[in-house]
């Protein structure tokens, strides 16, 4: 990209685009940004030089917490689900918040009107080089995106996860965590009858506190959810977390809530140590265990010793 800038701001060539398309985000290499990790001194120095500014370096370092992008089979499955629910592509207004390099934009049906939002300027520039001919890429924080509520027919993507509370007086009055905020704002930006199709941390559905789910349920019905196994994103983004694909449909004004129950949690049907606290899972999965792509189990997780996971039982691409 530096070469493109230095040569008059030209677009990337097809060969350069092929290289850029392999980008999986800063989240896959957090150790390069860790000044205490001496194994990557050379790589750290080279990357600082390539980013060309302290601001660019700081911005990239901040996104290592949540810049995890999505493999092609999962993206294609999500678009397939949207199309099965009536998204035909012709003039459909689509938003991808936290778009990264544009994985979902790249697989969008022909004829869709696409907008991507990406905080990291380097990654947004990659998306622009890859998909600028067919999409509008906004290099800004999702909190700063100013569009009318109901502006989109479909919001699709992989929402970021981090223990931060975005400041947005309009769309985060409940002071929800980042992943839930993305979903709540996405629902606001979706027209009545439109869809939000998103990958999110399992904590959206499994958190004991139902406040975020209640706020979502005040606007939308759950169409369905699929829980992916651990390591579903290890190959493409370097992260090893359990995530859900959730599909929400924005209710028209005055419509009664419908669809499956999903606001409460219950005891997960797994064996645990006698002294361990019970692990909880969303009531949707207790009623629909076939929507868990693997076996529920207890493991040592990213944030605690005793955490719910899903061990794979087959080839995710085939499931």
Pin down the residues of each PLM region.
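Class I S-adenosyl-L-methionine
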Residues: 1-130
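Conserved proline-anchored active-site loop of SAM-dependent methyltransferases
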Residues: 9, 75-85, 89-110, 116, ...
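Surface-exposed cleft-lining segments at the edges of enzyme active sites
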Residues: 65, 169-173
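Short, surface-exposed basic-aromatic patches at helix termini and helix-loop junctions that form
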Residues: 108-111, 128-132, 155, 188, ...
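General small-molecule cofactor/ligand-binding pocket signal
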Residues: 115, 136-138, 226
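Conserved Class I SAM-dependent methyltransferase catalytic core
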Residues: 119-121, 174-234, 241, 245-247
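S-adenosyl-L-methionine
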Residues: 125-146
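Flexible, glycine-/basic-rich loop-and-beta segments that form/coincide
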Residues: 235-319
């Amino acid at each position: 990209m530096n070469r493109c800038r230095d040569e008059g701001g030209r677009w990337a060539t097809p060969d350069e685009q092929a290289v850029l398309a392999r980008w999986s985000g800063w989240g896959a290499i957090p150790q390069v940004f860790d000044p205490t990790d001496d194994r990557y001194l050379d790589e750290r120095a080279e990357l600082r030089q390539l980013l060309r500014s302290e601001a660019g370096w700081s911005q990239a370092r901040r996104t290592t917490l949540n810049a995890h992008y999505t493999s092609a089979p999962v993206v294609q499955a999500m678009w397939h689900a949207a199309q099965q629910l009536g998204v035909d592509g012709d003039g459909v207004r689509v938003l991808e918040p936290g778009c990264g390099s544009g994985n979902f934009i790249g697989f969008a049906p022909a004829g869709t009107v696409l907008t991507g939002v990406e905080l990291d300027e380097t990654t947004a520039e990659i998306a622009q080089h890859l998909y600028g001919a067919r999409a509008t890429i906004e290099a800004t924080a999702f909190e700063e995106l100013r569009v009318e509520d109901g502006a989109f027919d479909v919001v699709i993507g992989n929402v970021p996860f981090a223990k931060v509370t975005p400041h947005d007086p309009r769309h985060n009055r409940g002071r929800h965590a980042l992943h839930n905020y993305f979903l709540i704002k996405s629902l606001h930006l979706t027209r009545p009858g439109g869809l939000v199709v998103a990958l999110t941390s399992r904590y959206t559905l499994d958190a004991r506190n139902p406040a975020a789910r209640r706020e979502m349920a005040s606007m939308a019905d759950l169409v369905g959810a699929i829980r992916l196994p651990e390591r579903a994103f290890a190959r493409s983004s370097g992260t090893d977390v359990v995530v859900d694909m959730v599909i929400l449909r924005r209710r028209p004004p005055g419509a009664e809530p419908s669809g499956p129950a999903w606001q409460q949690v219950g005891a997960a049907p797994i064996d645990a140590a006698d002294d361990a606290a019970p692990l909880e899972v969303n009531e949707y999965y207790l009623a629909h265990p076939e929507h868990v792509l693997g076996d529920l189990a207890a493991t040592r997780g990213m944030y605690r010793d005793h955490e719910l996971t899903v061990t794979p039982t087959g080839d995710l691409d085939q499931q």
